[in-house]
Amino acid sequence: MQILLANPRGFCAGVDRAISIVENALAIYGAPIYVRHEVVHNRYVVDSLRQRGAIFIEQISEVPDGAILIFSAHGVSQAVRNEAKSRDLTVFDATCPLVTKVHMEVARASRRGEESILIGHAGHPEVEGTMGQYSNPEGGMYLVESPEDVWTLNVKNEGKLSFMTQTTLSVDDTSDVIDALRKRFPKIVGPRKDDICYATTNRQEAVRALAEQADVVLVVGSKNSSNSNRLAELAQRMGRTAFLIDDAADIQEAWVKDAACVGVTAGASAPDILVQNVIARLREFGGGEAVTLEGREENIVFEVPKELRVDVREVE
């Protein structure tokens, strides 16, 4: 059985930054550090940080006065941000800069009185945070998930309308929704480049290349990870059997026993150690040496806040 690895896969710059913010805060200030929502959607990462003293909460009211609070990589609404400001808290923002860019687009539309449409998944924390940047009662902020949603949407003024997208969507599905928006609202204005982030796009391209050769595709990522789910869906759409797994223990031998080639990738919030564990598990089932496919090089780095720019090893 051949083992192929997608390239790129795993951590993106936004996830790296968010995890570093929590790790550095723990090193500098000590436990406990409070984090609103899971800092990234990966069980292994969250459990690891929890063991080191991070406390994950959903409501600002759960945080005691004087504590350190970190916003997750998914971002928060202005209401949450203002609630935190009203408290005696030291706040660090781990929102991915590419999510912040979308927040700024929404806030700009709100100030101008333009109505805005967000393409995204209802209930996802990034969507809640992005929708929460809009505050103009004269306008409107709407969420659509599919072309069908677009055709049933009514707005106040089609002449002052813009759209944005969640950063972790399927490139193909989003393109279909954007096409529907432009047909229904010919004057709608969108970003110069859609808001789906480079890491999401690159990992979807890598899965396409992987699925062209693999019989079975294993996507390492947690069930609540939007970008990981999109990778599994894309492989399935290409006619491959695909499984979303948290770690190597999830793999059933029956999934791969008849496969000549198994492809492995990881969502943007999944650490490489989980991929290495999957490779080891597949080798127990008769897999050969893992081969990494050629792919797009990523060298983007997002800096942590200056107050947290320390060498954790020196602090420890």
Swiss-Prot record:
Tell me which residues this entry annotates as catalytic. 126
- GO biological process annotation, one example: dimethylallyl diphosphate biosynthetic process
Q: Where does dimethylallyl diphosphate bind?
A: 41, 74, 124, 225-227, 269
Residues where [4Fe-4S] cluster binds: 12, 96, 197
Provide the GO MF annotations for this entry: 4 iron, 4 sulfur cluster binding; 4-hydroxy-3-methylbut-2-enyl diphosphate reductase activity; metal ion binding
| Amino acids binding isopentenyl diphosphate | 41, 74, 124, 225-227, 269
Cofactor(s) required, per the database record? [4Fe-4S] cluster
Give the record's pathway: Isoprenoid biosynthesis; dimethylallyl diphosphate biosynthesis; dimethylallyl diphosphate from (2E)-4-hydroxy-3-methylbutenyl diphosphate: step 1/1; Isoprenoid biosynthesis; isopentenyl diphosphate biosynthesis via DXP pathway; isopentenyl diphosphate from 1-deoxy-D-xylulose 5-phosphate: step 6/6
Q: Which reaction does it catalyse?
A: isopentenyl diphosphate + 2 oxidized [2Fe-2S]-[ferredoxin] + H2O = (2E)-4-hydroxy-3-methylbut-2-enyl diphosphate + 2 reduced [2Fe-2S]-[ferredoxin] + 2 H(+); dimethylallyl diphosphate + 2 oxidized [2Fe-2S]-[ferredoxin] + H2O = (2E)-4-hydroxy-3-methylbut-2-enyl diphosphate + 2 reduced [2Fe-2S]-[ferredoxin] + 2 H(+)
Which Pfam families does the entry link to? Answer: LYTB
Where on the tree of life does the source sit, at the highest rank? Answer: Bacteria
Q: Which residues bind (2E)-4-hydroxy-3-methylbut-2-enyl diphosphate?
A: 41, 74, 124, 167, 225-227, 269
Q: Which UniProt keywords apply?
A: 4Fe-4S, Iron, Iron-sulfur, Isoprene biosynthesis, Metal-binding, Oxidoreductase
State the free-text cofactor note: Binds 1 [4Fe-4S] cluster per subunit.
Q: What is its EC number?
A: 1.17.7.4
Q: Does Transmembrane show up as a keyword for this record? A: no
Quaternary state and interactors = Homodimer.
NCBIfam families in the record = ispH_lytB, PRK01045.1-2, PRK01045.1-4
Q: Give the family from UniProt.
A: Belongs to the IspH family.
Tell me, what does this protein do in biology? Catalyzes the conversion of 1-hydroxy-2-methyl-2-(E)-butenyl 4-diphosphate (HMBPP) into a mixture of isopentenyl diphosphate (IPP) and dimethylallyl diphosphate (DMAPP). Acts in the terminal step of the DOXP/MEP pathway for isoprenoid precursor biosynthesis.
Sorted alphabetically, which PANTHER family does this protein's record hold?
4-HYDROXY-3-METHYLBUT-2-ENYL DIPHOSPHATE REDUCTASE
Q: What is this protein called?
A: 4-hydroxy-3-methylbut-2-enyl diphosphate reductase
What phylogenetic lineage does the species belong to?
Bacteria, Pseudomonadati, Pseudomonadota, Gammaproteobacteria, Enterobacterales
